[in-house]
From Swiss-Prot:
This is Evasin P1104. It comes from the Eukaryota. The keyword Transferase does not apply. Salivary chemokine-binding protein which binds to host chemokines CXCL1, CXCL2, CXCL3, CXCL5, CXCL6, CXCL12 and CXCL13. It is found in: Secreted. One of its GO terms (molecular function) is C-X-C chemokine binding. Its main location: secreted. Keywords: Disulfide bond, Glycoprotein, Secreted, Signal. The keyword Ribosomal protein does not apply. Disulfide bonds join 48-66, 52-68, 62-79. Glycans are attached at residue 51. It comes from Ixodes ricinus (Common tick).
Length: 94
């Protein structure tokens, strides 16, 4: 009987320690800045008024600061403005 009681106390102590460690790790993570809160990591994207098309590997239809964005193998896309120049290289299509 004494050994069963001792085993129960050991299990209860183990559960308490695991709970405290888990609670501490969750609390420590919440104090760090998330990736979305970091400076310079977000930008504003707006749709332009025009659509764009692909003909013989060349995309056309976007004007101004807009770039063409398509989905998959589609030959049609939407023109988007990324606000400040965030992308220095062309966006890969499809």
């Amino acid at each position: 009987m004494a050994s069963n009681l001792f085993t129960i106390f050991q299990l209860a102590g183990f559960v308490a320690i695991v709970f405290i460690v888990n609670l501490h790790s969750v609390s420590a993570e919440s104090k760090e800045a998330s990736a979305s809160q970091g400076p310079g990591k977000s930008f504003k994207v707006e749709f332009c008024e025009t659509n764009c098309t692909e003909n013989n590997g060349v995309w056309s239809g976007c004007t101004g600061d807009c770039i063409c964005v398509s989905v998959g193998d589609s030959k049609e896309g939407r023109c988007m403005d990324l606000g400040d120049k965030v992308i220095d290289t062309p966006v890969a299509q499809g």
